[in-house]
Amino acid sequence: MKRLLTTSIFALIIAGMTSCSVQKKNTVNADLPNKKEVLEVAERANQYFMNKWPDPGKEIVGKKVWPSNLWTRAVYYEGLIALYKVDPKKEYYNYALDWSQKHNWDMMRGTFTRNADNQACGQTYLDLYEIDGKKHPERIKYVKMSMDSMIASGKSDDWWWIDALQMGMPIFTKLGRITGDKKYFDKNYEMYAFTKYKHGGNGLYNSKDKLWWRDKSFVPPYKEPNGEDCYWSRGNGWVVAALAKTLEDTPKSDPHYQEYLKDYKDLLQALLPIQREDGFWNVSLHDASNFGGKETTGTALFVYGMAYGINKGLIDKKTYLPVVIKAWDAIAKESVQPNGFLAWVQGTGKEPKDGQPLAIDKVPDFEDYGLGCVLLAASEVYKLK
């Protein structure tokens, strides 16, 4: 009788532990964004843009006239391709293909430009090359020529602003993976290291705060109004995206993989305590008084980087998932409007005060890159499980 009683009690304890475990697991995942709803938000925002720009090759007319393969549009297509990979609609593919063909698969301002902003379009060319089974070498001909010329020059100081990391690093690593030639990985690190350790005197990375100054003009003694260092949200978002993409394509055996991983994880960790209550991050990460408020682009890039890390098992899901959910919920409810217009987007610039003040109905100088950031975020949030 004693043995039966003991066995029964033990079974109840085990059942209770199992139940708690299941409940805990369900609690962790209970608030995951609904996949259909994530796609609906992304599709709504994207359709608004495609309706407004039916001709992907059309020049962009603002204060100046820009060819449509400039960096802002390139970032949009990075997001569109990411969306296509989780929701392969032919219209997305055709839109990206038409854009690439109209620019002859070449860089903005010529094949041998050294400016990462002009080269960013190459990321989509490389993606389309792979999507079609590597059957069209003309799609990567000029990208490869451009990167090869960078390598041949021996120079490594071109990425003097941190936005350039997102525009340029993924091209080197994608080429490295596609061709199997380690020279692209080597050059990528050489240029990254110059930005991190040398630009501005001692580099643009603050190892103490685990955040990045946008360029040398923001390295101390420059301060924000509250006396803190100036860490621009979108600028640090570009670094997050650059590192996520670099980790995706760089072999783990690469001698610099662990450094990329550490920098990526440290940056994400630095973002945790400064997320706003409403889910967004301020444009000035360490000075909420300097145009603090909702801002979509930096927040979307942080969501992209964090969700990517969760999906790849690079960061702790329990720690980061609530942060991602809170931020994505803010984007879905506050940023993407019922008609697809994207609100709270800081215009182009280099610091918190640019493009201010923001508003729910304010149209930024370019409407494309903000959408690209949101589509990148949506593509990784969709994969969460």
Residue ranges with predicted function:
Residues 50, 54, 88, 104-109, ...:
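Helix-capping and short linker residues that terminate individual alpha-solenoid repeat units
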Residues 21-27:
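Bacterial lipoprotein signal-peptidase II cleavage site
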